[in-house]
Amino acid sequence: MTSQLIKKIVTGDEIRNAFLKFYSEKLHKIIPSASLIPDDPTVMLTIAGMLPFKPVFLGLKERPSKRATSSQKCIRTNDIENVGVTARHHTFFEMLGNFSFGDYFKREAIQWAWELVTNIYQLSVENIIVSVFHEDEESAKIWSDEIGIHPDRIVKLGEEDNFWSSGKTGPCGPCSELYYDFHPEKGLQNIDLEDGDRFIEFYNLVFMQYNRDPNGKLTDLKFKNIDTGMGLERMAQILQKKQNNYETDLIFPIIQKICEIANIDYFSSDDKNKISLKIIGDHTRAVIHLISDGVSASNLGRGYILRRLIRRMVRHGRLLGITNEFLPHIASVGINLMQNNYPDLKNNNDLILNEIKIEEIRFRETLERGEKLLDELISSGQKLISGFKAFELYDTYGFPLELTVEIAEEHSISVDVKGFEEEMNVQKERAKAASSNIDLTLEGSLEREIDVFNKTVFNGYKSLLSEAEIKGIFLDSTLVKEASEGQKVLIVLDQTTFYGESGGQVGDIGTIFSNDVEVLVDNVMRKKNVFLHYGTIKKGKLTIGQKVKTNVSSSNRAKAAANHTATHLLQSALKSVINESVGQKGSLVAFNKLRFDFNSSNPISKDQISKIETLVNSWIMENHSLEIKNMSKSEALEKGAVAMFGEKYDDEVRVVNVPGVSMELCGGTHVKTTSELGSFKIISEEGISAGVRRIEALSGQSALDYFSDRNALVNQLSDLLKANPNQLFERVNNLQAELINKNKEIQKMKDEIAYFKYSSIKSSAEIVNSFSILVNQIDGLDGNSLQSAALNLTSHLGNKAIVILGGIPNPENRKLLFVVSLGDDAVKIGLHAGKLINEIARICSGGGGGKPNFAQAGAKDIDKLSDALDYAKNYLQKTLASHSDK
């Protein structure tokens, strides 16, 4: 056979290249991997190899060719808890696929799949089992009669296993799956394909041949399609003869680096450590690709998925004993491992490592905040931390459950683990519903309804007024033929002068009108190049086909144009003042302000903000004329045009150029000259997530109004402080100095009171077995003063001191404070201030915690203060007497 002449394929790269080469020779067009950020609004991430082809399968987009093949990077997080636990679950994986769009069907798909796995990958027939849908006799016959597989190797399964569908309605069809048998010696009787130790499914052939209507009836599709998927990691496990996917050359080099940092050996590690190693190895691949595709860590959407993955990596690093920052070192290995097939990883190397570093540092700080929140829960006197609270600590603060349980147990508090698991299951179900299905149905939503419309022609760059024809009217997302006065509508036109919200710029407002109708348009959105005009009918009736005119508000368009041009100038100024690597992470161009999000690990100083404002205003005064041209994307990038990181652009792009200042790819509206902006003012700068800063600014009339309001405020302050505007700074400084002096005097008086009070009781210490016990009530001191008194008493009494103070700071508030301070020798015999104070405070319906030598607590029941202090004294006397007996 020809397989004897073919080089043995083993490595992950060889498997991928062989697959693409094989189908390329079968006249399939090789399609590069799409981004992990899909064009499809119904899914958050690219979760399957076929997702980039979904519009083709639906007939909404022209097919790239009749046949296609790809190696598509994918991410799924719906089974994240199984990652590292099973041999084959991953968040990041590569799906090899071959696709037919109305060309070949079952026979060729099966024949070529068999040729690939037996001739190219050289798998033995003895190791292959095939499954088919139990009603799909056609596929079963092809496998047995034409391929020659023995019927005992063909397993017929039901609809749940071998019938693919995108939803309750839409395209669907049977599928046939290829399984690898690791133990063929066990024979072919009573085969159970669910036996994960023996079988692994590695190639799925979907025969998309039916359309299912709402009644469940199946009818043949006009064009039958093929959609296949082969997991690269699974095929690597098979060909490299490994126990699991993680030990293949696709992931194991990352795991080896983790072992080096943790100073452990993978093969001699226990199961718990191996799971942590696998999780970090898997998540590393997901994280570097997400960041490279433009995702930044945040608390929303894709950003939250990225943040969660990074936090899991840090957590499992801690479980392995890694206490220092380590993720950038791991990520570098992942980048080096995959950059040949994904050059974007190399190009974005610095960005990836910086994002990971910042997020790791931030999470370590978050862990500290989580510990503080946990301390508050413990201090509240609760004897049980609810599952909801434990899950909040885990989900919001990234605080591991086992850490919550461990700390709670130190304070004799239980954690509702079952309740935590219930909350976790609720989240899992939400995740599955959001991320595991690819919707190919066409009914029921605005997203699908607009597919029937042609692209809206936008002619609003040169004119604000034009004629148009109504092509669609929506009421409550339902397509209707007409609408009447008073109704809120969504209108689709054949052409428009209204700018549709995109690129951060808000949609225009204005009117759509004719002689007998008027619609006030308050927003315009753009979806799939169809402009959606939202408005209210003020008079008349709208009908499909009606001729109307569009009239955009010129004043608001001018404001948006000024703010959009100002945004471009701001980005150039940021690059000049801070760093050339500054890039846009998001923006808002509204009528009254602009907002710009950008990558920066450090806050922007006041001096830098001043320089940025000065630079932008100098460009405004220089009166630069803008040049706007359409050109190919490659030409624009060669000329130095700035593109937003992670944004998708057509082959032809619009370039907005302020010569010598700024050049960007942009579809927004702009002024003709920079002097039209008038002035520019930054009103705020803040961090919004790890490594991302936000600037809000004003231009034009909004900036002038801001200056006017500030001037009025200065005049009001001048009147209030009885000082001229130029004397305000000196006047406020003097007032601050006076306030500081007054506070010092007050604190001095508090310290004197505290000194007097603790001096009056320090001689009342009781000696028990050589230890000095001082338990007393001191009222009228705040927390700081009570703490100071306890520490001074401990210092006075020495290493064998045991000081417990309780008091009422203010009788009107009816709250108690407790402080426990122990000398070194008291700690050595086993006393723990944190545990002791918790028991004392509970008597008064309170709680607290702290370190072995010092702790503080709060409580509510002031009537039981004496009982609490008596308990403390009796407990110490018994404990020390017991220590004496020993």
Swiss-Prot record:
Its cofactor is Zn(2+). It is found in: Cytoplasm. One of its GO terms (molecular function) is zinc ion binding. It comes from Prochlorococcus marinus (strain AS9601). Zn(2+) binds at H564, H568, C666, H670. Consists of three domains; the N-terminal catalytic domain, the editing domain and the C-terminal C-Ala domain. The editing domain removes incorrectly charged amino acids, while the C-Ala domain, along with tRNA(Ala), serves as a bridge to cooperatively bring together the editing and aminoacylation centers thus stimulating deacylation of misacylated tRNAs. It is an enzyme of class 6 (ligase). This is Alanine--tRNA ligase. HAMAP family: Ala_tRNA_synth_B. Binds 1 zinc ion per subunit. Belongs to the class-II aminoacyl-tRNA synthetase family. Keywords: Aminoacyl-tRNA synthetase, ATP-binding, Cytoplasm, Ligase, Metal-binding, Nucleotide-binding, Protein biosynthesis, RNA-binding, tRNA-binding, Zinc. Catalyzes the attachment of alanine to tRNA(Ala) in a two-step reaction: alanine is first activated by ATP to form Ala-AMP and then transferred to the acceptor end of tRNA(Ala). Also edits incorrectly charged Ser-tRNA(Ala) and Gly-tRNA(Ala) via its editing domain. Its main location: cytoplasm.
